[in-house]
């Protein structure tokens, strides 16, 4: 029997959904425990969330096979975000409005606009990979090491950070929002 024709595949989808929901829920509970002053309990929620994430990844890989390249994952993510803002949240908002839940309908619409921005961001990042612009900018840029904060000006970041020895992959273009 092929996995695609089996009840086991349905069980894998259910297990993946359950584990990802638990991962999210325990992450929320961790934040609340921290806020309430229970650091040890927060750490246990964090550890359990990490475990649930590992379980989710296990089931996900059975469902989809190997996780794709970063470029493939960006394309997949952009498609997911497009569906969410063009279809899913619009339908959810309509349904909520029909049932008299105006506030929830409005929240669905606001989240849809965020999902649209996510799609645009994923598409731009994919384009950066395709055009070789992730670690190169014509005319130069200010690059910051995400590990230690070292700042480098140039068309590309250094191959190795001269301060902390992390690889080029840890550099990003400096963004100032202050």
Predicted regions mapped to residue ranges:
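Non-heme di-metal
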Residues: 1-178
